[in-house]
């Protein structure tokens, strides 16, 4: 079973439309919602499998945004529900699956990899000129956190991956759930590095599948561009920021 956890701050009607779309496209998948918007908007969301994320670490400067509370709350949610997934997938609200077999391809890819964690651009960033690594390579709090838990020969090794689209085996999620991850550290560095030092194996989606070829930082995808792309059967796209066009996009995907 795959649990797919979505992070959103959008208005309630937008969130409910997205969760209905996902449930229709992937009926064999179990969905939940981590909501980081206003509490009063959270209360308006009709989708029942939701949890509120009030942690300030979700907000603030991009290089210090920490989504650990979302990952940990997802683990707490499925345990409360008595659900035992073997895989957990984490996407932001601007990540749009485009095919009904998207989740099957997620499973096929991680099984082909043999890894515990897959992410976009997932790699060892140590001694590279990658921006997030340069920002954190001498960060005493991060390095102390990693050294305290590391089973690796080099506790200063730093891994990174795009926060959107992370796919983990349940054992990896469980290893993060009851751990103090409250550092002011970017998710894209903190989560992969923590899992690496705990002894888990990490890999890059693109090494085993084309499922994330439609995932990028920028520019955002536009509806007209997706009209041309969808006949070529891409698996997903990120980022799609045009909230007003989401209903039309959902219709386009579901009728193909």
Label every PLM stretch briefly.
Residues 1-2, 23-33, 50:
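Short loop->beta transition adjacent to catalytic acidic/histidine clusters or analogous donor-positioning motifs
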Residues 2-11:
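A conserved hydrophobic helix/loop-capping motif in glycosyltransferases and polysaccharide synthases
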Residues 11-25:
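Short, well-formed alpha-helical segments that are part of the catalytic scaffolds
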Residues 35-86:
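Active-site-proximal specificity loops/subdomain of glycosyltransferases
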Residues 83-85, 113-116, 200:
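Short, high-confidence coil segments that cap the C-terminus of an alpha-helix
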Residues 85-96:
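Short beta-strand-to-loop acidic/aromatic patch adjacent to the donor-nucleotide binding site
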Residues 96-192:
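Conserved catalytic core of nucleotide-sugar-dependent glycosyltransferases
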Residues 176-256:
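C-terminal catalytic/acceptor-binding lobe
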